[in-house]
Amino acid sequence: MGCESPKNTENVDLLTSKAENLQYSQVFLPDSQIIESSTLPSELNHAIKSKFNKQSLIPIKFFEITEEEFNSILNRNELVDNIIKLYSSQLDEIEYEIDVKYREIPPIKVLDPKGGIQYYKGGFNRQGECHGKGIWVKDYNIYIGNFRNDEFYGIGLFITEQGNYYFGNWKNSQCNGYGSLMMDKKLVYQGNFKDSKKEGYGEERYPDGDIYKGAFYDGEKNGKGQYIFADGSRYDGNFRNSKYSGFGQISLRGGDSIRGEFKDGKLNGDGDFTWVDGTKFVGNFVDDKKNGEGIYVWSNGKSFKGNWNNNVIYGNGLIKNPNNGTQESIIIN
């Protein structure tokens, strides 16, 4: 790096020091913080899809069982009991109707020719399909709720063998409408679904404490949203396929902020940094790096206007000091 006879070495030293600090400081949140969104956990999705294989119960061999045997299967452990109790107010009506309306219909044990054993207690239609309110158990997966023509339909609670569960609206045995998804005894998503994918407004929570609030489409973060990091930092703006995309702003915990156009999770195009001490940089970025023309303005009013290539200052530049009315041109090779 060389300079052409700078009139004031203090300005150059200040510029160099500030530029080096900015060049190597971690001003962006690491990519690893952006957790890719997904549809329902595969374990839950598989359990839902393994239901009736689109067959009615009539051609499948089934046996009556006692209420005691059915209840022992349903209440297989304390975890399931606690989950059911959590939604007792919503499930009371369903369980009451099963007890009263279907009192004369015994629970059944179903031998599925495609494998597995199913248990069911509830209503049927004339075709022998599960219809109305009922309780269904298969491979330690439990569904308590409404059925229509052998499909989960309406409000229902689905509990997996591992104790993860979904409570909310169903249509055609898919999560459709508003619902809550719990994993490892913690709420991981609350919001809207379409065909078992997150769609519409929702709130997603992550194991490390991060939270996303905003729009989803096809199971991914798409549209406007807010990603709040566990340390208090946050991103407000647009997303595409679960990455920063479009205009957005990152507000860091210490008070610094980054604002501009993002693409594929990185700053691309016009943007600006504002530090808590009042220092500001405005310029062009490519993949999170300063590229092209930009200007630094320090809190004391001094400024430097110049060019960058991959975060490195090069070429002609102009330093201004409005406090004493001086300015100087420099060349950095």
Show where each model-derived region lies.
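Intrinsically disordered, low-complexity repeat tracts enriched in Gly/Pro/Ser/Thr and acidic residues
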Residues: 1-333
